[in-house]
């Protein structure tokens, strides 16, 4: 009888320890999330996303010849409004949709700063679709929560990342950066 009790007690302890280890492993992965990626800045220098640890991040695939390109103004506006509260926008130029980002990195940088006075970080041009999809976008589209996953369908798809590096929400291109929906989501993460 005593041996049966000890075996049961041992089994319970093993289950509890395994459960705790799984929770810790999940937390460790979630804590690293987006921070594990390093891409190049628009100037071609390595720019680790870990530099933004502790900030709320909006990741956006951008293009300079798209019907949604005027969203640069609203992106810059919300960046200016919230940057001192720990918010940053990261723009990733991509030429995957209708060849609407054909320029070089230098041309993209000039366009963004002259036409829209962009001050938030813009990265070097990448691909957001397969077969040459950047690892960051593989993560965003395949390794996040089911409501967030899915192929990028067009320019200016946005991903909101919490202060721990976890992707918490996705906004399709038609959702403007200054919309009530997006502003509320950003403010919720900044609290």
Task: Please annotate each region the language model reported.
Residues 1-11:
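N-terminal secretory signal peptides that target proteins for export/translocation
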Residues 13-27:
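Bacterial N-terminal signal peptides
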Residues 28-50, 134-135:
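N-terminal "domain-start" segment that seeds a small globular fold
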Residues 41, 61-65:
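Amphipathic alpha-helical repeat scaffolds
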Residues 68-133:
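Structural microenvironment flanking redox-active thiols in thiol-disulfide oxidoreductases
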Residues 135-138, 142-191:
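Thiol-/selenol-based redox modules, centered on thioredoxin-like
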